[in-house]
Swiss-Prot record:
Top-rank lineage group of the source organism: Eukaryota
Pfam families linked: Toxin_cobra-type (PF21947)
Extent of the signal sequence: 1-21
Name the UniProt record assigns to this protein: Beta-cardiotoxin CTX9
Cell location: Secreted
The keyword Disulfide bond appears for this protein: yes
Taxonomic source organism: Ophiophagus hannah (King cobra)
Gene3D superfamilies per record: CD59
Transcription regulation as UniProt keyword: no
Disulfide bond entries: 24-43, 36-61, 65-76, 77-82
One GO MF term: toxin activity
């Protein structure tokens, strides 16, 4: 009985995320993401217009979402891997 209880505790610890962590995409590839540091609990996707048909996209974690401008479109979100 003790072995079963210990096994359940270990499985619970392994399967559950014991701390709050946000996971955000940080590359254009959909399967590559990083765990955000403490305090950065939002995901961001910034599209920077360089030339009429060329764009840079930056993805990652952020604490405060900046405002968009004429040359930069900013999208912030609050769920895991939401910055596609």
């Amino acid at each position: 009985m003790k072995t079963l209880l210990l096994t359940l505790v270990v499985v619970t610890i392994v399967c559950l995320d014991l701390g709050y962590t946000r996971k955000c995409l940080n590359t254009p590839l959909p399967l590559i993401y990083k765990t955000c540091p403490i305090g950065q609990d939002r995901c961001i996707k910034m599209t920077i217009k360089k030339l009429p048909s060329k764009y840079d996209v930056i993805r990652g974690c952020i604490d405060i979402c900046p405002k968009s401008s004429a040359d930069v479109e900013v999208l912030c979100c609050d769920t895991n891997k939401c910055n596609k």
